[in-house]
Amino acid sequence: LAQFPNKARIVIVGVGGIVGASVAHHLLARGWDNVVGIDKSGVPTDVGSTAHASDFCYATSHDFLSCWTTLYSIDFYEKLGHYARIGGIEVARVGDEARMEEIRRKVTSGKAFGTRARLMTPAEIKEKFPLIEEDKVQGGLWDPDAGLVVPRSQAVAGELIDKAEATGKFASFANTPAQSLIVESGRIKGVVTPRGRILCDHVVVCAGLWGRLIAEMAGEDLPVMPIDHPLTFFGPFNEFAGTGKDIGWPLLRDQGNSAYMRDTGDPKTAEGGMIEWGYYEETNPRLCHPRELLEKHQIRLSPSQRDLDMEQILAPLERAIELTPILGELGYDERRSFNGLLQVTSDGGPSMGESQKVRGLWYAVAIWVKDAPGMGKLIADWMTDGRTEIDHAKIDYARFYPHQLEEAFIEGRCREAAQKVYNPAVHPREPYATGRNVRRSPFHQRERELGGYFMELGGWERAHGYAANEHLLAKYGDRIPVRENEWDNRHFWRVSNAEQLAMSEDCGVVNLSHFAIIDVEGPDHLALLEWVCVARIGGDANIGKGIYTHFLDEAGMVRADLTVFRLADRCRIVDGADAGPRDYHYLKRVAANKGFDVTITDVSEKIVTVGVWGPNARSKLQTVVKDADGLSPANFPFAAIKPIEIAGKTVSAFRISYVGEQGWELHMAYEDGLAVWDALRSTGAIAVGIETYANTRRMEKSLRLQNADLLTEYNLLEADLARPKVKDADFCGKASHLRYRERAHQPAILCTLEMTNNVDSHGVPRFPVGSLPVMDPQTGETLVDALGRRSFTTSIAYGPSVGKNIALAYLPWERAQVGRELHVEYFGETFPVVVAAVGYKALYDPENLKPRS
């Protein structure tokens, strides 16, 4: 056994699982050396989820990043000789129309994100999976790339560790738990183990079920929780005796019953001669905190394999027997069956990336077998390059607000996630029921009195529309289609479209309290912002202005989209709620890396913002401000920031518009917000829900949203947001940005599409939500640009002012011409679209005259 080292560049905690082993492999592939892996038990693990995982991979989901990591992982396993690409089936039972629709939606997502899933008939299902009762299913999905990691992901982890050790650049140590972390001045310095201390520059936590306990050593928490996942075995099943196969027939998912099943191949293989049936509890999932996990000497099988009571699964098992009677014919192997612990997360994404509190401490936690090599690659690239080849906003641990890392919040959200692992289908606009009313505007009670239809973002309760405005439907109803399809109409309120139309005729007040607001001050505050921002921030001419700008990553791709208020003594960043935490932590890290003397403070809960917009915004606002003439166009130019007084309160007014109308953003102290809201409402301005601001009018104005339309997979010119000139000062990503500008044209450009016919085959007008593939009308193939990036809608909404379904999508340069006809697919049906605008060009008020009026 190698001597335990006292120094390393990187220590991987939890190296015995498939995630830790994958991280080790990819770090070495990126040129790292002197890497040490430790594990609380065996290497490969005999106690973690990897030790009991079902090890199957389905390629298709509704999330691009998940499809990418799974497809990468499948290829990775296959190149190692450890993947049986046997295919996977998903079925919809007769009578379960919701599941059949979900299967159609999933096939469509596959076309968008690059999987080969297709629909299949009951006869095809029976042919591929003879154990099924054909008359019980109405159809299904065939995923040809689905399959099984063979013989086990546990064995693959062991092989990866052996190969890593053979390089001489890596050493692993079993039965070596991390007892504490050594942290000095906010930076990781090492790990304490029973074998001694090991000093290091970086620690990567891949401890799976125990990940939260390691994070606790750094004074933080991870929003993940282990849940019981019943895994049952029936046998003996000798169909594949003598074949040597680890699996004979395709995988089967019966997600309407929240279950799956598969054979385990030849009885002579390690797990063989059985039928495995697994289930995810929908109504009463059993979660546990990692502190409740037992040690392996305290439990029959292992800490991640808890005893299973047959009563827990009797009802779904009876339904499974109806579909596949063999489960009732074979013997139930109680000794081999168990509750396997796996992890769910508070928002569907794992905890990846650098700690919020400790520099050099990294997490890769809550990752399933199907994604492990892909996530291992992302972490290695992230640590090496500071970026990944696909946008990682959805998995970045920096995305979480402090309240989202509190134990009660984590348990509530994880319980909701556990109830929806397989069923029911999760809507793109699905709200959470727990963790609500955490952050509310100072005029929240007024919004409740108006009958606000609330959703939540970043903890803020946001009304998407107001019941009190439904009288407007009498006036505007003929311009606002009724959404007959329940899925299209779910979590949408028709009144919000009426509010938009009313605002554009008169004036509306919009609650923008969800803004993430960050103050940057100190001697080097301008130096910091000049480095991270594409736009010029310094110079006396910018004082008193709001500067719309972007952060780029090291490769010149779009990392952030925000506004900087240049104040006399500091800068104030106004950001979206979704992107705010990541941008806050990014600023702090850059400042530390560069040695800038700055103070960066999140003041989101101290400042409240209200938008007042419409053709009568100025005249209405003039009735409640102390100095009415101060709002005249001559005295208050576009993009200026000036103090005004409303209801005796000092308000910082920013003349800008995200809704394409004349008006201002009004920023004030939180405690002054109610008085200002009441004063604005006293003018007769209607309350307008956030739907208009965040979706419908934003789309009509061709305005881009970070983490949806703006991603680190595309550059600023492809988003058509590059400034006419590049500033003299250096900034992050500048060299790459200059290279992109030298191209004759970009590989892709963000375009606006209009649906020219939205009526489906049943005669029902559709109003799509989610990501739709953009396809060639002749071939039906999804468009792919010169860099291999696929075209799908990044935002989509019905625009009541233009009277059309409109979407944003990156199109290959050669397809990006106004008037070009293309197709999109929605729930398996094809709809025609036309390119209405190439690049940043609004459909509503294309000359942008209204905001400047």
Question: Where would I find each of the regions flagged by the language model?
Answer:
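Flavin (FAD/FMN) cofactor-binding and adjacent substrate-gating region
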Residues: K79, A84, G95-A174, S180-R187, ...
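Glycine-rich FAD pyrophosphate-binding loop
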Residues: L28-S49
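Beta1/beta-strand and adjacent pyrophosphate-binding region of the FAD-binding site
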Residues: F4-V19, V36
